[in-house]
Amino acid sequence: MARSPGRAYALLLLLICFNVGSGLHLQVLSTRNENKLLPKHPHLVRQKRAWITAPVALREGEDLSKKNPIAKIHSDLAEERGLKITYKYTGKGITEPPFGIFVFNKDTGELNVTSILDREETPFFLLTGYALDARGNNVEKPLELRIKVLDINDNEPVFTQDVFVGSVEELSAAHTLVMKINATDADEPNTLNSKISYRIVSLEPAYPPVFYLNKDTGEIYTTSVTLDREEHSSYTLTVEARDGNGEVTDKPVKQAQVQIRILDVNDNIPVVENKVLEGMVEENQVNVEVTRIKVFDADEIGSDNWLANFTFASGNEGGYFHIETDAQTNEGIVTLIKEVDYEEMKNLDFSVIVANKAAFHKSIRSKYKPTPIPIKVKVKNVKEGIHFKSSVISIYVSESMDRSSKGQIIGNFQAFDEDTGLPAHARYVKLEDRDNWISVDSVTSEIKLAKLPDFESRYVQNGTYTVKIVAISEDYPRKTITGTVLINVEDINDNCPTLIEPVQTICHDAEYVNVTAEDLDGHPNSGPFSFSVIDKPPGMAEKWKIARQESTSVLLQQSEKKLGRSEIQFLISDNQGFSCPEKQVLTLTVCECLHGSGCREAQHDSYVGLGPAAIALMILAFLLLLLVPLLLLMCHCGKGAKGFTPIPGTIEMLHPWNNEGAPPEDKVVPSFLPVDQGGSLVGRNGVGGMAKEATMKGSSSASIVKGQHEMSEMDGRWEEHRSLLSGRATQFTGATGAIMTTETTKTARATGASRDMAGAQAAAVALNEEFLRNYFTDKAASYTEEDENHTAKDCLLVYSQEETESLNASIGCCSFIEGELDDRFLDDLGLKFKTLAEVCLGQKIDINKEIEQRQKPATETSMNTASHSLCEQTMVNSENTYSSGSSFPVPKSLQEANAEKVTQEIVTERSVSSRQAQKVATPLPDPMASRNVIATETSYVTGSTMPPTTVILGPSQPQSLIVTERVYAPASTLVDQPYANEGTVVVTERVIQPHGGGSNPLEGTQHLQDVPYVMVRERESFLAPSSGVQPTLAMPNIAVGQNVTVTERVLAPASTLQSSYQIPTENSMTARNTTVSGAGVPGPLPDFGLEESGHSNSTITTSSTRVTKHSTVQHSYS
């Protein structure tokens, strides 16, 4: 088919357009000739619509802004078609990191560089150029642009390590490679800029030069100089690296350290310190050190080249010795590991060879020649102990022995002396015999049977019974040795086979029954057994058959499965044909099982009936019903009945407990404010019309205040502040002498007892209540005093009718068996116990006769204070504090100084006064003091000699009082008493008459007449060191800061007051009892003789609490 000419022309035109048509052209606008990599083109060359150009080359580290634009792309379609073409570049430096390296003009296609290039960071840039129309579509094929960064020598070599470490053996051959060092250069590889050259800068030690360095590879080799570790163990090299093939430039040069350690080789032969060695061992010793072999080696310490290796050359064929190396000291330790006997060998000679643990170096291997080292060991003879020739012996006995064999000798276990080989003098005892089969003769070691052997005993293991025996030598030091006796028991056939489980239960669907027997005898008198079923009752052997038999058991099978219980008799014989006389019976129950849960319980009909116990109880109940009418016949009926006879004296016998004292009586308390002659009233807390007295200064706790009398509670105890009465003021204090008001009633707890300090007029109105209160207070104080010397055996108690808490030690502890309680107060218990005394004595008691007997002189003391409280007429309350100086002479005892004054009945009252706020100083350890503390106490009383007949107590009778006593102690605070240290004691007595009589000094009791007045004493005592004054009161051993309470009570009845009791005029009564308690003082001191041995400068407190017919002085620490 012929083609048309028009188509041929169209094809030709298309070819022409393809060859001549527009394309994207790249033009490199500038190049550098010095690179010699890119040829210079005077014009663009077209190859099939694409411009092929060489890559662009730019040098690093230069300012390239003067060379912009470095490239340009252009499309011919812009002129041919008149299109608006925009150009774009992508790639590293523009759209990929690092950004901002290049910028382009989208209209002209020019590419500019904006920063200095770094080849080490980016050695090559690959960009892609695009020609885009207005819609962003490519109008030309994208064109690649390669930009290479040319390198410059801007980096120096850097070592990979600051310190290189290597090693080489000593005695190494020349040119031995030691190690290789390495450095890197960041410039372009395989160029002159990155070619590194190495060099050794220095070497320590510098001479001789033992290493050289390959400058191109960095390898270090040894020279021909021989390395010796014993001379230099290490070397240090300083090396440097330069690029440019070692060209010297002004760039800094990096250096590194190279440390080379010389390795040790076994090139030294060990040397022994001593050529001949000796040692000594005791016989019969083992694991003891004999000697040490000292070795020297010049090789590296601790290495195998240094450690010595010892071997026996000769003499140790018996294996007596062992040698090992001490890794710390490199010494050979020779140890005896096998006992030697002096009698057999007295000397041991052997030799050893010394080498190293590591093999010798080839350089000295031919020079080493082993030399034996002789060692001589002497055996020391010692006194040996005892021993058994054999530590274990065997004795054979039979189980068939009868009782006559007990005590039979079955063997002996003799110990021998190792030195002489003769039997030793020793004692033999059993160490272990669990079933006490034997006895051992302690002298001859003979072993006797103490119990018949039993093969079946649980202590027999495999037919052997074990006993251990200890032999103790008689010589000193004693030595012991232990031996073992094995008693082999010969078994006899004395046991027959028996069933292990004679009662069994199986389910009806079980095929077999396992029947097992046992025999306590051993082989051959036990298994295997023979089993046979005895046909009793007939047919049993057919019903139960033996299906399979083992050594000691059989499997029994039932021919007919039938529920119920069966008793199957067996004949079981042992291996010797011996069987038990009685047949072995197996009680077997075959039952129906429910799903494997066991047999179903058999159903039985329930039966309810009375048992024998129920019938017996019914008969017993019937008999009891018959017995009740018989008991009713014995009761009294009608007139014959009698009532209960009351027990006489039930009111006295059934004493109402927890009720102390008589019931209180309600009485009206009259006014206690008398009017004096001047019309002034006595205040509620004081006494009017008191004379002014000077106040005593010092450390005393007693304050004398003008016109005032009061009590206050300070620091847990009572302190009294009062003033002196003088002149006519005492005439208006009332018939009973009461100077305390009703509002000053307080409880003093310093003595440990409850004391009611009510006024004397209140006692006159409620006499019975006050009497009982005083009585129980005295008794409680006495019991408390005794309790302080004993450990408390009960706790503090509070009774229901007490006004305050109980004492420190309860009055329940009033009877200590081991104590020394003075029970003489039972001699006179007062009127309250008169009825009880008459009942006990069976006779009437005359009270007046008893009082007349009491008026006779007596020397023994009692506690009868409450029984005479009805006669109280004057109450004086005072409390003074004495401060002692630094030291005083040691006083005499109180009994010796005042024995003549105690001529009548003496009543002792004790109290304890404490002052908690005052710190108690620790007494100094002075055994004796150089001075004394003297306190003088004297009482003078007078009264009418007419026997009184009645008791009259009333407030209208004038009376006189004891007002005060003063004590001056030598102390630093008593500066206002210049005569306090003169060493004198002054006692001043004043008498105040009821009708205004003045007070005159008295010389003694001989001036007092039997007139109706009461002497009031004002005494001034000076506590001062005085050798000429006889003390009447010795102070206890007290320390600084402690207190001593002195209590004085004085009663003197006035003639105008009728009294039922009389104190004779010619007698003077003073009683003192001192109780010392506190640190360093155990308790009461007898005979009132208290000496001061501790530190002085103490405080003494004197207080008067109430008036009795006696005088009591009390001392106590606080």
Curated annotation (Swiss-Prot):
In the record, Phosphoserine modifications are located at 680, 700, 703, 723, 726, 806, 810, 815, 1118
Which residues does this entry mark as bearing Phosphothreonine?
Answer: 804, 922
Q: Which Pfam families match?
A: Cadherin
Q: What free text does the record give on domains?
A: Three calcium ions are usually bound at the interface of each cadherin domain and rigidify the connections, imparting a strong curvature to the full-length ectodomain.
Q: Which disease is it linked to?
A: Arrhythmogenic right ventricular dysplasia, familial, 10: A congenital heart disease characterized by infiltration of adipose and fibrous tissue into the right ventricle and loss of myocardial cells, resulting in ventricular and supraventricular arrhythmias.
- The identity of this protein, by name, is Desmoglein-2
Its subunit composition reads: Interacts with PKP2. Interacts with CTNNB1; the interaction promotes localization of CTNNB1 at cell junctions thus reducing its nuclear localization and subsequent transcription of CTNNB1/TCF-target genes.
| The record's account of how the chain is modified after translation | Palmitoylated by ZDHHC5 at the plasma membrane.
- The organism named in the record is Homo sapiens (Human)
Please give the start and end residues of each transmembrane region: 610-634
Give the keywords, sorted.
Calcium, Cardiomyopathy, Cell adhesion, Cell junction, Cell membrane, Cleavage on pair of basic residues, Cytoplasm, Disease variant, Glycoprotein, Lipoprotein, Membrane, Metal-binding, Palmitate, Phosphoprotein, Repeat, Signal, Transmembrane, Transmembrane helix
User: From which residue to which does the signal peptide run?
Assistant: 1-23
